[in-house]
């Protein structure tokens, strides 16, 4: 199950004690800051969590899976996320405990 912005707001309300309006503003502002930084071409480093950055992908050949026809995939910029070591360790510990 995915964690939604609405669930984040609810958790801030329950665990931090912000009222729902403040919690929603906090979550919206956080994501606005991330978006603004990426739009400016900046890398985002969240200590203990991971890094977001823009990566330029060159044009490359692709193939239509139905017809087999070669089609070019145009150059584009994508957002990438690389998880930090602490996040990897916590996820590994959680996944390991479920197996």
UniProtKB/Swiss-Prot annotation:
Function noted in UniProt: This protein is one of the two subunits of integration host factor, a specific DNA-binding protein that functions in genetic recombination as well as in transcriptional and translational control.
Matches recorded under HAMAP family: IHF_alpha
Species assigned in the record: Xylella fastidiosa (strain 9a5c)
Keywords: DNA recombination, DNA-binding, Transcription, Transcription regulation, Translation regulation
GO molecular function, a single term: structural constituent of chromatin
UniProt xrefs under SUPFAM superfamilies: IHF-like DNA-binding proteins
The name this protein goes by in its record: Integration host factor subunit alpha
GO biological process: DNA recombination; positive regulation of metabolic process; regulation of DNA-templated transcription; regulation of translation
UniProt keyword annotation of Transcription regulation present: yes
SMART domains in UniProt: BHL
Any one annotated GO CC term: cytosol
InterPro entries: Hist_DNA-bd, Histone-like_DNA-bd_CS, IHF-like_DNA-bd_dom_sf, IHF_alpha
A Pfam family reported for this protein in Swiss-Prot or TrEMBL: Bac_DNA_binding
UniProt keyword DNA-binding present: yes
Gene name, Swiss-Prot/TrEMBL: ihfA
Quaternary assembly: Heterodimer of an alpha and a beta chain.
